[in-house]
From Swiss-Prot:
Name the record gives this protein: Peptide chain release factor 1
Post-translational modification: Methylated by PrmC. Methylation increases the termination efficiency of RF1.
GO CC annotation: cytoplasm
Compartment annotation: Cytoplasm
Amino acid sequence: MEEIFDKLQAVADRYDELNELISDPEVIADSQRFMKLSKEEGSLRETVEKYNEYKEVTQTIKDDTEMLREESDPDLVEMTKEELNEAKERQAQLQDELEVLLIPKDPNDDKNIIMEIRGAAGGDEASLFAADLYNMYVRYAEKQGWNVEVVDRNETEVGGFKEIALIITGDQVYSKLKFENGAHRVQRIPATESAGRVHTSTATVGVMPEAEDVDVDLDPKDIRVDVYRSSGAGGQHINKTSSAVRMTHLPTGIVVAMQDERSQQQNRAKAMQILKARVYDYYQQQEQSEYDAQRKNAIGTGDRSERIRTYNYPQNRVTDHRIGLTLNKLDKIMAGDLEEIIESLIIADQAQKLEQLRNE
């Protein structure tokens, strides 16, 4: 526990430093820095409050133990023993709570997300499954009270999606959907399969936190913008005007094309929103070793090629391979009942991080 208390003291010292900084007129004048530091201060507050309470309770235990050695009055001894037992119970409770609070927090957990769903291996059936996943996430978002906005789509002739991109906004969206990153495999009999054979197809899901200006600063000189005529729906008007936009971030080579909106201005805004998220995601992977480790852990939140889940329609079964969870309610899950899977993933991730914390 000594290492944990060293970490707690470091958190308390940083909290005091932050309180001084956000009272500094120079920091207050810099709105972006002030917001960033205030957010950090708020994230540490509960930990510091519980740590201070832990120190008070520990002192109470020390004082009561000393008093019992010296006190002879029976009533006072009884009262002190009662107080000591309560203090020890509270100390143990606070110790458990502080360990959980020390688990490294994902700075993106409270962010909105950009989700990209693509049909992968399996042709038309993969595109249809991509559409099924889209509907599943929309229904889950509705249950959470979140808002879903489709910003780009590439539909297939059979009613599926080669690719669909959406922005999901609301409370703690990334914290709940970040574990959806990866390859989702479906096993079912396609409608066109006359022999009744089960086919296996795959769709990939990418989840990126929506980047704020404070997170990523894109230099306009680093962005090449091309405009061209949209090939999407919209009749004569959309083909006569150069409303589609392609943005290239030159330092990383990341390209975003947007033609879903009617006007070039709207497409520019959406393309920039997605470009920021992709660049932010790219730099987090490249530059932060801690973030890299988190993305490659046993729970898995990063690699889109990693097979994370299988949806078996004939047996009405869903299996999450990362935590060995199998649920026989595929019909409900596809209707947006994802809570049990998501909560299980969050608990497994926290348990793993707590184990790492104890072993450090």
